[in-house]
């Protein structure tokens, strides 16, 4: 049986990076494996679940929504036995899920506000991953929320400047200015490795929109830049 998965592979990376960062920044425990599997199953569920609101192929999307939800529940049981309070982070996601549903109903999934809602959901997943092992809510949990979120907002603006909004100069300048501000903020705060983490994104935001690249090329470059960002983020904060 072939899995029903969205072809937005970049979103998978966006869903996993904050979670893994939160786990590594905290004290990883065995139950994190089940929490990760449960979270990933929930993420996979979002594709068929949101498509239910389009009113087409309902049986197919109902089937896969149930399959992924069941998998999420099964994987989550050991994690919830370890720390059930992580559910609070899931409840905090619900308003942003409502935003996703709203834009899906309007057939406007590419709306920037919809993208931002998704990024905030991923940030909450990262916060939950950090909190999970020791029930710690401190300054570092804000790092988990803020640093990947800034990076992925920049990524979203850049991708729009390369693809659907290529002819809209506002997205190009928004992408460049946002990346530049992120780098400058960390330079001013003397967090130089964090500033360096945003430099590859800034370079590609300035340079690549002038080039004609295929969707695959854009995706591969983005994967490499995300990997560099993540490595430098770990070096700067672990």
From Swiss-Prot:
The chain crosses the membrane at residues 19-39, 64-84, 85-105, 112-132, 141-161, 176-196, 218-238. It comes from the Bacteria. InterPro entries: YwiC (IPR025576). One of its GO terms (cellular component) is plasma membrane. It is found in: Cell membrane. The keyword Transmembrane helix applies. Signal peptide: none annotated. To B.subtilis YwiC. This is Uncharacterized protein HI_1626. It comes from Haemophilus influenzae (strain ATCC 51907 / DSM 11121 / KW20 / Rd).
């Amino acid at each position: 049986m072939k899995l029903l998965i969205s072809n937005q592979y970049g979103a998978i990376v966006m869903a996993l990076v904050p979670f893994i960062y939160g786990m590594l920044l905290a004290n990883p425990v065995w139950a994190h494996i089940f929490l990760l599997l449960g979270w990933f199953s929930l993420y996979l569920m979002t594709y068929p679940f949101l498509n239910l609101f389009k009113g087409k192929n309902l049986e197919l999307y109902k089937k896969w929504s149930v399959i992924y939800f069941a998998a999420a529940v099964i994987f989550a049981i050991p994690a919830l036995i370890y720390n059930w309070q992580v559910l609070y982070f899931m409840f905090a996601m619900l308003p942003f899920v409502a935003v996703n549903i709203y834009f899906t109903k309007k057939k406007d999934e590419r709306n920037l506000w919809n993208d931002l809602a998704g990024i905030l959901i991923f940030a909450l997943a990262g916060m939950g991953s950090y909190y999970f092992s020791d029930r710690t809510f401190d300054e570092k949990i804000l790092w988990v929320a803020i640093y990947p979120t800034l990076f992925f907002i920049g990524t979203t603006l850049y991708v729009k400047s390369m693809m659907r909004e290529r002819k809209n100069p506002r997205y190009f300048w928004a992408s460049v200015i946002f990346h530049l501000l992120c780098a400058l903020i960390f330079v001013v705060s003397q967090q130089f490795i964090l500033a360096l983490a945003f430099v590859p994104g800034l370079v590609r935001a300035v340079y690549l929109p002038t080039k004609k690249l295929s969707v695959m090329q854009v995706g591969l470059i983005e994967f490499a830049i995300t990997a560099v960002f993540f490595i430098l983020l770990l070096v700067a904060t672990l």
